[in-house]
Each structure stands twice: as C-alpha cells, then as structure tokens.
Amino acid sequence: MWFENFVFKTFKYHLSLISIMSIFRAYDVRGIYPDELDEELAYKIGRAFVTFLNSEEFKNGLEKQGFSKTFLNVKQVVVSQDMRTSGKSLKASLIKGITDQGADVIAIDGFCSTPKHYFAAYSLKAPASIMVTASHNPGQYNGFKFTRDNAIAISGDTGIKDIEKLVIENKFEDVSSKGKIIKKDVTDDYKKYLLKFIEPSKVRPMKIVIDAGNGTGGRELELVLDKLPLDVIKMYFEPDGTFPNHEANPLLDENVVDIKKKILEENADFGIAPDGDADRVFFFDENGERISGDFMTALIAEKMLEKNPGAKIIYDLRSSWVTAEYIKKAGGIPIMWRVGHAFIKDKMREIDAILGGEVSCHFYMKDNFNTDSGIIAALRVIQIFSEKNKKVSDIIKPLKKYSASGEINSKVEDKEAKMKELASKYKDGNISWLDGVRIDFEDWWFNVRPSNTEPLLRLNLEAKSKELMEEKRDEVLNLIRD
C-alpha cells in the first residue's frame, strides 16, 4: 500500500509540475483558473518575483544587457487587475506573496487596463510591476504580465523562466520584516496624460461605434471622449469578466459581428474595438470592414513622422510590403522585426524607434514609454481619420495594393525540420531566419513561424496579384502539410 501511495503522490506531483510549466510562456504567465492557475500558485509567484528581482541572476542579466543595477534590492511592486472574475482573489494572493517576501505593494484601485497599469508603474517610478490579466483570452483564463523599472517588460528570456524555476523549487528565504500595502488611484493623472495624445480642436464632428467587449477599454476611453465633438455609440462598456455578449478578442470574426452590424445600422464613420485589457485595438471602416493592423501601423507612422522626420518605425515581419513603402514615403526608416511585445519593445529602445506596430493590432510608442496602448492608438486614429476628412474606406484603399493570405495554421510535429525543408525548396529567394523563416521573391513572399505552445506552423503570404497569391498559398501549404 505504501508503494501505491508513493506512486500516486509522485504522479500527482509530476502532473502539478506539468501544469505549472504550461502557464509560464514567452511573454507572460497565463492559464485556466483554477485548474492551472490558482491562489496558491499566485502566492508563490509573488514570492518568486521579489526573490528573482533581488537575485544575482537578475543582476548579471542586467549587466549583459547594458542596464544599470542601481534599482536592485527591490522593495516596491505596483500591482493592478482587470475585470476578470478571478482577478480579485488572485491579486490578493499575489500581493500577500510579494509582501511576505519583504516588498511593499502599490495596489492600483479598481479595474485597470494594461496601458493604465503601465502608466501607473512608470509615473510612480516603480522598480517593478505585475498586471493581473489574461488579455483577450476567454473568461476562464487569467494570468500575469511582469515589468521591471520604466515599465520594461520581463519576458521568458529575461526572467519568466527564472521565476518559474523558483516557483517549482518553492524554497524562499525568510525576511526580517514584511512589506506593506499602499492603495493608489491614478485615474485623474491618467486622464491628463491621455489628453496629450489628441488635439480636440482638430477633431471634427463624427459618428463612431465603440465596442468595448465588457473589458477595461470603454471606461478609459470615456475619460477623454467627452472632450471631443463625437457622436459615440457605446457597446458593452460595463466591465464584466464573464463576457456576457462576446469574448473580448476582436481578432476573431465571431466577436465583431455586433460592431459591424451597428456601424451599418447607425451609418457611422468608423468603429473601434479594444480587446479585454486594451493593449490592442482594432478599427473598422464605414462598411464594417476590419482594417489590418499593418495598414494602421502605416497610417499612425505617417502622422507621427510629421513631427519626427527621419525616425525609425518597427513593423512585424508578417506585415504587407506596403507598410514599409508608406513609412519610406512619409520620410521614415522602416525596420522589420520579429513578432512579440517584449521583442519589439526591446528593439525600440535599442534603435530609438518612435513607433512599433504589429499585424495583431498592438501599437507601441516611444512617447508612451515604448509600451502598447489601445487607448492611445485609438485617440491618435480618431484625429488621423478626422484630419484626412474622407471616408475611411477611401483612406485605406491605397494600402490594399497587394493580396495577402491572412494567417493560416497547420499542424506540424517537427516544426524545425519543416521550416528547413521550405528554406531548401525556396533557396533562390531572399531567406531570413529572424522569426521562423521568411523568404522574399520579386513578386511574392511568405513567412512561416512556429507556435510557442502548440505543434503548429503559421503561414503568412503576400503577392502582387490575387491569382499569384492563391497559387503560391496553395503550393506552400501543400509542402507544409505533406
């Protein structure tokens, strides 16, 4: 019997480890509550976070990256949460873990978007922060996003793996005194900050539809909307982590049915849909057609380059050729980079770029401490569309120069071998291994990237004609799926 109990306990322990390891990802911690992420684990993560920030490993990592070590011996962490139903209890357990490890916590009052959290962390000069959110994931998920000083993201390569290791080891040193909790409301300061990104006098009367998806973005846009001459049709502005109307992920077609319909019903000029934690935002023209994130990167870049001629703009390698063309035409220097917020933010700081944009509708801005904000992007785009004083579809039309496949997933067990096979097949093209494999030819290109969490390869392909795009899309897919 003792052997059976031993085997059962060992099996249960290994299952627990597998569950823990599955939630520590490339950019954040994210899992299903409470099966994968619960209060006990949140407490351990709080202790592990403070332990890591004060470790020699972190100090050495900073030295290698060329950063200052002066903020070590971290004694203060900003913690915020979005509207998810599990957020309150996870936040409380996380805070207890942080304070039990000797650091003070500045707890931001109320529901908070990720952009507002970044603002709080940066403006309060916090040496570190944690945002409790699962971004655009369904309601049963929750998670944590980590930053160090200046709201700089901590990724898998710069700390999340170390935090995971500490959680698994579960051996934390006792501290002489516990930290305290300081509650803080930054809403008034945040409102003043947001108004820096739009000039109300340059916004003409327009009718717009905003679907907040019961996330945090609607309430935060309301801080500024009353200053603008807009007729705003508000949809699902009440924060509700059960997402009673649809998931707060506007990337999926089923979640934008309502806003598309409302735009047409109201004869609106355009539509705006932030995701759950408002780090992303999606735009729709007067016909209810969703506008690709790379097109919006081009338009925002064009506007920002007016005051920053010759500046560098980062765009992700899934973007249309037209993105770089638009940036060059506007007097900027386009820089292609890999997908992922931590990678783009790091690159922006490295090359002093003023803007980074992803096809997935993340927009990162130097004047917003190199972080992504769906709120600020929305304000900038409202002014852009207003100043152009044309139908939004007419503004976007010149950007639809090429034909794109969209992202297509294929199940592949040996992802690395398949990408090498593609590189060999298309060796006459210009090959880049920046993020997966991207191969450019004169009249078409494709990128194949591996999923971080699943046995999937993701294909994006573009060509100078629809016929060529369809031909090459089918050709490459057949090779991937063979």
Model-derived segments and their meaning:
Residues D109, K161-K192, K196, E286-V359, ...:
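Proline/glycine-rich low-complexity loops and linkers
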Residues E306-D482:
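Phosphate-binding and adjacent anionic-ligand microenvironments
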Residues N142-E266:
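Gly/Ser/Thr-enriched, mixed-charge loops and adjacent short helices
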Residues L17-K96, D100-Q101, K183-M206:
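An N-terminal, well-structured beta->alpha segment
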Residues G66-F67, F71, Q76-N142, L195, ...:
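N-terminal small/polar loop signature for handling phosphorylated ligands or for N-terminal nucleophile
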Residues P127-S135, G139-Y141, I263-D285, R290, ...:
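Glycine-rich phosphate-binding loop
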